[in-house]
Every structure is written in structure tokens, then in C-alpha cells.
Amino acid sequence: MNMKKLLSLLLALCMVIGIFAGCDKGGEQAATEATTATSAEQAEVVDYAASVKLDETSGRAQIQLTQSGIKQFVDGDTTHFWVPSSVMPGGILKARYLAVNTPESTGKIEEYGKKASNFTKEKLSSAVSIVVESDTATWDADSTGDRYLSWIWYKTEENGEYRNLNIELLQNGLAIASNSAQNSYGETAVKAIAQAKAQKLNVYSGEKDPDFYYGDAVELTLKELRTNTAAYDGMKVAFEGVITTNSNQSVYVESFDPESGIYYGMAVYYGYALNGLGMDILKVGNEVRIVGGLQFYEAGGTWQVSGLQYDAMTPDDPSNIKCLSTGKEPAYPETDSEKFLGKLTIKTDDAETEHDYAFLAMNTSLTMKNLQVVDIYTTNNPDSASNGAMTLTCKTAAGNTIFVRTMVLVDENGKTVTESAYMGRTIDVRGIVDYYDGNYQIKVFSASNITVH
């Protein structure tokens, strides 16, 4: 009898343990299901750029444009648009995107700066309609006083919906917050940033940017190098541009800056350091990355970059010069004497500075027309490589004096060109902005770059 009771108790105990084990397994299953649901919620990606809607009745200042209304892409968060003068005096609206701050691509280059810039260009270049919108009823300037804080909307199909490019940059991790919560779409902007961080996209990825230079040089634009040259004296620098001229073991490299609307350039001395594939990189019309040391060239009174290298055995070495693309035409923009001898104000986020235009345009290509040659000096020194080179003193219709310095020029028959070819004539020239003996001048490298009227 006692044995039967004991067996009954043991059986009951096993049943209870089984029930609890079953309950525990169910608890584990419930917890697993809850975790799976949470993960699914976390994995759900929201297209925040499409979730906000353009309200054309909001009362905020707006202007609708087509793709032809784009004047210039500057970087990831700044674009210039053609607008009626009733919207903006001068007909140009310089839009600084609200709520975003993309990495730099126009001064000192930052990681993902080029990617952000290309992203903006790609999106707006495919648009059939663009709306630039203020956050208020008026166009509000940023700290520079020259750019206007804007939302940028675009659509790629006539019957499509507008997307908000500012928020699209944020949700793709191509911009960081910039007063992102204090605006009309602040809540959505903050969510877009949080999602980009959760997905570890681009600037939040912790990974290297494949388009960024990771060498030991300071990567910057030619504008930054030309406007703050002394700050980089003796430093190793890296920059990109198009080769316009190759002469006397030097090349001239230039790039266009849409913010100031001019080209910036630098003389690059390669000497005897390069041959073969390295020299192929330095062909006129190639877009290149130059890496070298910046120094002041005392004999010429100008800045130059030198110390170039190219090792064919290690082509990916960040210290190598590099060809980025080919077939680019040197610009040679037409420039008049008033502009050449005038001043230009450069605005940045921190300051506004005035420079001689020719100082900023040093080492860049230009065309100047209708120059009346009134005097010529010819170098007469048989021991000099410049023997036969000329300095032409020219007058313009505005009464300005322009100096044109030539190399030793030869005609199509191989004969040296002399003063008689130009004295008293009206000429058009194509050359490089140069500086000598206290004067800016136009340096001409070939007789084909002087057209006689």
C-alpha cells in the first residue's frame, strides 16, 4: 500500500515537471517570436524622402524649375539655380540645403564628400521638375549672406511624386545633422538620421571611403590651395585638375570652382623624376591627381608643386600621381582686361576676402582678344634658353596695358618668330596667367596661340 502511494506521488511529480517544462518551452518560443518581431521591425527600412509631401499651399517661399534651371552643382549641400530676378536679384539663387551638412568636397576634401556631391548631382540631373522651398514665407540667407537656406524637392517622372533631397541625403548617411530638428520637417529628418546610423551607411559605416585619398598628403581643392597658399608651405599636398600645358619640365593644372565662378591652377614641376608611364599621365587634356610638395619658387617668384613620383610596380600607392580620366579640353575662358586687372571677392563660411583677379587666376588658361601691340622687348642672350623670347606690351580698347610673354616661338617652317610678326598689329592670345617683375602677364607657349588680325 505504501509502495503504491509512493509510485502515485512519483507519477504526479513527473507530470508536474512535464507541465512546467512545457510551459518553459512555450515561454522560450514566445520570447523567440518577440525577438524575431523586434528584429523585423528594426530591419524595416523607411523611405523618409518620400514620406514627406510637398505642400504648394504652405505659404513658404517656393520656386518651381526644370533641369535647365540648374546653374551649377557646388557640392553635396549647395546648388546654384537660375531664377527670375523677381525671386532673387541677379537671377541666381544659391541654395544651401537645410538640415544637412555633407562632408567637404570644395576645400579640404573629407571622407564621403565626393560621394555626397555626386549623389546630389545624379539625383537632380535626372529630374523633370525641381522645387526650391524656403522654410518660411521669405528667402532666408545663411551665415555667408550669399546663400539661401532651402529644401530641395525633385521628381523624375511627370506623374511621379516629389522626393525631398535634403532628407534623402540624411537617410543615405551622406550628411550629418545641421539644426535638423528645428525646421518644418524636423521630426522626419531626425528619424532619417537615426535609420542611417542603425544601418551604418556611409559616414556612419566606420568603413573607408573608396573615393577618398588616404595618403600622407593633405587632400584639398585647387581653390583652397590658391587662396591659402602660405598655410601649406613645405607641406605635401594632393589635388585634382586638368592639365592644360606641358612645357619646360612643368605642367599647369587647373580646375573650375562653381562657387566663385573661376578656374584655379597650379604650376607643377616634374623635372627628370618621371619617365614612361609617369609621363603618359601628364599629357595635356588628362584629368589627374597630383601629389607633391608645395614650395615658393624664388627664381620665378611664384608657388609650385614638385617632388612627383610614379612607381609602376605599385600603381595604387597613394603617393603616386594618377590619371583619373582623359580627353578633357583645357578651358581657355575668354577674359577681358577689366576683369583681368580687377578685384574679386571670395566668400567662405568664415570670412570674406578681396584679391587681385589675376592672383587668383595664376597658372590657369585664358583667352584675351583685340590686344594692340605697342612695344616689344626681345631677350638677346645667346647663352640663355630664352634667347629670342619676347615680351609684348599691349593696349586694349579700354586703355589698359596687358603684357604678353612668349617662349621662343617658331613658325610652321621651323623659323624663329621675331618682333616684325606682331609689332603694331592687333592680336588674340591663348595662354597661362603668369607673374614676373611685379606684373601679371599672359604667358604664350606656341605661335599657334597668337592670332594676328
Range-by-range predicted roles:
Residues 24-26:
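Bacterial signal peptide processing site
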Residues 7-14:
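Sec-dependent signal peptide hydrophobic core
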Residues 1-6:
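Positively charged n-region of N-terminal signal peptides that target proteins for export
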Residues 18-22:
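C-terminal motif of bacterial Sec signal peptides marking the signal peptidase cleavage site
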Residues 28-44:
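Intrinsically disordered, low-complexity serine/threonine-rich repeat tracts
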Residues 106-118, 122-125, 159-160, 183-190, ...:
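Soluble non-cytosolic domains of exported or imported proteins
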Residues 44-167, 265:
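Electropositive
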Residues 41-57, 197-453:
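OB-fold nucleic-acid-binding modules
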